[in-house]
Curated annotation (Swiss-Prot):
Protein name: PAP fimbrial minor pilin protein
InterPro entries: Adhesion_dom_fimbrial_sf (IPR036937), Adhesion_dom_sf (IPR008966), Bact_Fimbrial_Adh_Pro (IPR050263)
UniProt miscellaneous comment: Strains of E.coli that cause infection of the human urinary tract produce pap-pili which are hair-like appendages consisting of about 1000 helically arranged subunits of the protein PapA. These pili mediate binding to digalactoside-containing glycolipids present on the epithelial cells which line the urinary tract.
GO annotation, biological process: cell adhesion involved in single-species biofilm formation
Coiled coil: none
Matches recorded under SUPFAM superfamilies: Bacterial adhesins
CC annotations in GO: extracellular region; pilus
Taxonomic lineage from the root: Bacteria, Pseudomonadati, Pseudomonadota, Gammaproteobacteria, Enterobacterales
Span of the signal peptide: 1-22
Length: 195
């Protein structure tokens, strides 16, 4: 059985800028240049400005916009003798993160949540695989053992600095149906939300 898994990863985010200032003109204590003179200035207009200083979102550092994770070849007999087959690790690397800091490099109140999107498998904790292979699904787990569910937000991950590696394990698991040899693939997306 030849196993191949493709994961195109999509990153969504936005940066928002907004602020407020609307003081008198000229500000108290400031005089206009002498050559302006009151007779040359019309004082019947007003401009209001507003803005906000925000922390920008992290940037996603990937070698390629489409990560392809090769699960290798697995004999059917290996899957018949257990619940799961091969595992592969992959990471989502975030860089240039600017979050609330309480000194040093400790970013104590900034967290992110990741959501994986794809076609649900036979149970909510599995993703469907396409192709000729039958009887298997894909499962994603984070480093704490939390299992991803299609379209459901995973537990929050605290950020510890301006560069983060979000590590996950992909594994092929049985889905209760009859095993059949063949190729398989899946296309999954993900979303990162900041708190």
């Amino acid at each position: 059985m030849r196993l191949r898994f493709s994961v195109p990863l999509f990153f969504f985010g936005c940066v928002f800028v907004h602020g407020v200032f609307a003081g008198p003109f000229p500000p108290p204590g400031m005089s206009l240049p002498e050559y302006w003179g009151e007779e040359h200035v019309w004082w019947d207009g007003r401009a209001a400005f507003h803005g906000e200083v925000v922390r920008p979102a992290c940037t996603l550092a990937m070698e390629d916009a489409w990560q392809i994770i090769d699960m290798g070849e697995t004999p059917v007999r290996d899957l018949q003798n257990g619940f799961s087959g091969p595992e592969r690790k992959f990471s989502l690397r975030l860089r240039n993160c600017e979050f609330n800091s309480q000194g040093g490099n400790l970013f104590s109140d900034s967290r992110i949540r990741v959501t994986f999107d794809g076609v649900r498998g036979e149970t909510p904790d599995k993703f469907n695989l396409s192709g000729q292979a039958k009887g298997i699904n894909l499962q994603i787990a984070d480093v704490r053992g939390n299992i991803a569910r299609a379209g459901k937000v995973m537990p929050a991950i605290p950020l510890t600095g301006n560069e983060e590696a979000l590590d996950y394990t992909l594994r092929i698991v049985r889905n209760g149906k009859k095993l059949e040899a063949g190729n398989y693939f899946a296309v999954l997306g993900f979303r990162v939300d900041y708190e």
